[in-house]
Every structure is written in C-alpha cells, then in structure tokens.
Amino acid sequence: MTPGVSEAALAALSARLGLPLAFDDDACSVMVGDQPFSIRRDGTGDRLVVSALVADDLPDAPSRKLVEDLLNLGFGLMHDGLPAVARDPETGFLAAFAIFAGDRLVAPEFPDAFEKFAAFAQRLADRLAAERDASPSEPSPESDDTHHDMLSSGFVHV
C-alpha cells in the first residue's frame, strides 16, 4: 500500500466524523465521545491498526463467560478487520484492536469499519466495567454474545 491509501482512508474517516485527522509520523489519535482511539500505520505502510483502551485491568474475579469471550476474540487476528483483545503485561491495561488492509482501507469501507470497531470497543468497555463493579455476591453480568454480535454486525464479510 502506498502512503496515499492510508492518507485517503484517514481522510474518509475525517470527513465521516467531521474532525480534522492527520497522521503524526505514523499515528493519529481521535476521540469518539469520551473514548480515545489510536490509528497507526504499520512499518510496511500496508495496514492500519486501530486500537482503544477498554479497561485498566481485568476484573478481580472475571466470570468464566467473560474469560471465554475474551479468549474467543483472539481469533480476530486471523481475519482482516476483526477485533481482538490484548493485555499489556506491564500495565495490565486491556486494549481492543483491529488490523485493516487492502479493500478495507477504501472509502466507505474504512469509516464504516471504524464505526463498527468503535461501537464494539464501547460495548466491551461497558461489559468489563459492569463485571468489575459487580460484587462477588451478585451474579456476573451475562454476555450479550459480544463476539457473535461483532461477527453478525458486518465485521467479517461472509
């Protein structure tokens, strides 16, 4: 991918959000509501990596369902544009991220995919916060099947 493609993808997102966006070196930060997102070009310049902090750490006693759902999200790395979740071993922060390449970087694909990713990241952040805030005597909030919802909402072309 030439730098023009990543610039065009960011310009399309900028127009969609009504915000002035530009890469500073190889990254761009954007706030959607109160959620910060990072958009970074990879070293080869042929992919964009979008990420968002979704929690400061795992809940103290995560439910089995939450752990299963987070592990299932690891398969996102196998598909262009499908979100995954990772934990920073130094800080404990949980981040959602997705990698976009090729046809996913042209308008309107990238702005559409970014909006879906932003909605996914917010739902995941809300779910993690709800589980963190649930007392041990209360049942943990059940999943709204975040991973399935993500798949059925168009993250993956079927």
Annotated model-derived regions:
Residues 104-138:
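A contiguous, mid-protein "functional segment" used to position or interact
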Residues 1-38, 78, 86:
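Charge-rich, low-complexity N-terminal segments
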Residues 41, 46-56:
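A short acidic-to-branched-hydrophobic micro-motif
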Residues 53-97:
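Short, internal acidic amphipathic alpha-helical interface segments
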Residues 28, 46-48, 92-94:
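Hydrophobic residues embedded in beta-strands of well-ordered beta-sheets
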Residues 84-116:
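A mid-sequence interfacial segment
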Residues 129-158:
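Short, highly charged C-terminal tails/helix-capping segments
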